[in-house]
Amino acid sequence: VVRHAGETVGDLDMHFLHEGLPERVLTGTWAPSPGPRELPEVPPDAAAWADALTRVLAHPNVASKEPIVRQYDHSVQGTIVLPLFGGPAGRAPGDAAVIAPLLGKPYGVVIAHGLNPVLASFDAYWGGVWAAAEALANLVAVGGNPREIGLIDNFIWPVPDAESLGALDRAVEACVDVMRATGRPFISGKDSLS
């Protein structure tokens, strides 16, 4: 029951809240990737090397994660101790951000992430393991204590077809294995299926 100024403005039956939506039964499939693609030819001259370098630096596995990271509130109400972005223009991403949830206290909270879209496209399990390993490395790089880590997953799986659900299952397996290997719990997450 939600009340405002002594008046009931919302009343949601708990049975409906917890059991009102029928559960869907979805089935996923997964098959191992056919393996690595062919290696590219060695660039024949300086111009071809420059082009290859430009393409590598633009690749999502290498390029700046700034467009992704700018989408969430990394400053958290002005309690930032170590900003996620640095450099003269404030656009160079760092390994992680550190916030002080209680001003004046000698401790903080580290916020880090990891991502490898190419590896995840071959196998969501190893993409998930890589993402967790990168996030953990980024956390430690700014002084985070690996024994005090709480993990958070964010899954966005917009197409609930069998192949996508199989990949989702592999990603969840990776989360479970990372949790078991590190001894660190998943404390929260957001999972979106269409």
Regions found by a protein language model. Give the residues of each.
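Glycine/proline-enriched, intrinsically flexible loops and inter-domain linkers
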Residues: 1-194
